[in-house]
Amino acid sequence: MMSNRSDFIVPDEAAVKRAASVNFHLEPLRPWLDDPQITEVCVNRPGEVFCERASAWEYYAVPNLDYEHLISLGTATARFVDQDISDSRPVLSAILPMGERIQIVRPPACEHGTISVTIRKPSFTRRTLEDYAQQGFFKHVRPMSKSLTPFEQELLALKEAGDYMSFLRRAVQLERVIVVAGETGSGKTTLMKALMQEIPFDQRLITIEDVPELFLPDHPNHVHLFYPSEAKEEENAPVTAATLLRSCLRMKPTRILLAELRGGETYDFINVAASGHGGSITSCHAGSCELTFERLALMVLQNRQGRQLPYEIIRRLLYLVVDVVVHVHNGVHDGTGRHISEVWYDPNTKRALSLQHSEKAQ
């Protein structure tokens, strides 16, 4: 019996051509896309590729991967998924023909003359619980405890001893979330850049700012993202600090460095920090360490989703997520100049809040 022609799915010729165009533009990356040991393929700028293998980054020079080719890859990918990527919509999230997830950022949302491409390869690895047990997966589970960890005790001892340089250095190395607060002209950005120098050079860093200030000459695996200073999430601007924060989650950052918290993007920053991306550093305007938490809470309330949360919940989240607040001041009138006036670090309060929530949940 002959089957009815309607039983067959006729391939869409146009879709096949669009997929072929994407695959053609991916050819310079094919050696790493086809390598089963590589999980992530990143292009930060023309001519260079960073790949993640066994949780370590590898660098490769690819001279034929020029700017025009990367622009064409973005255009082909956008057509394949029936989306747009352009100067007015410079961020694209998509799934490639072979199932890889891709994130593309082009100018003006990144540095002029560069394009950021992040490709995450799907994992086909299957493990049983027995496999996990043999690999020691369950050997390091720590029960909830009121006791501080050795690292927390170390940081607290440095702070109480007044060794603030060593305290800040270790806080960065231990991937604590740090907020630098102070008034305009107090030196927040300059201190942020000093803290960034303590980040290990092999980590992948992504900065978000409206004006290029957070330079990373010693960290080769980095991407600088930019948003217009007048862009507002509430007005549905295509590129804002908040949209770039969300984009970061698809770009495999080790750390996210946001130049300044000014409004509703604070909600997204807290979300990102709470999702396990430790080591983030940012700044805000505030008159003291305690007022920093008030300012952050008020800025969370400027977000559509954030304002749905009770103020007490927002404050609690901030104390759980933010590890260190450094307040800087410019003593113009008393002649003290720019200096750190306060440092907040209170792991005991953080632990108590966490345990309190855990006990209520039980």
UniProtKB/Swiss-Prot annotation:
GO biological process entries: secretion by the type IV secretion system
Domain of life: Bacteria
Annotated positions binding ATP: G182, E183, T184, G185, S186, G187, K188, T189
One Pfam family per UniProt: T2SSE
Coiled-coil regions listed: none
GO cellular component: cytoplasm; type IV secretion system complex
InterPro entries: P-loop_NTPase, Sigma_54_int_dom_ATP-bd_1, T2SS/T4SS_dom, T4SS_GSP_E_ATPase, VirB11
Protein localization: Cytoplasm
SUPFAM superfamilies reported in the protein's UniProt record: P-loop containing nucleoside triphosphate hydrolases
Entry keyword set: ATP-binding, Cytoplasm, Nucleotide-binding, Virulence
Name of the protein: Type IV secretion system protein VirB11
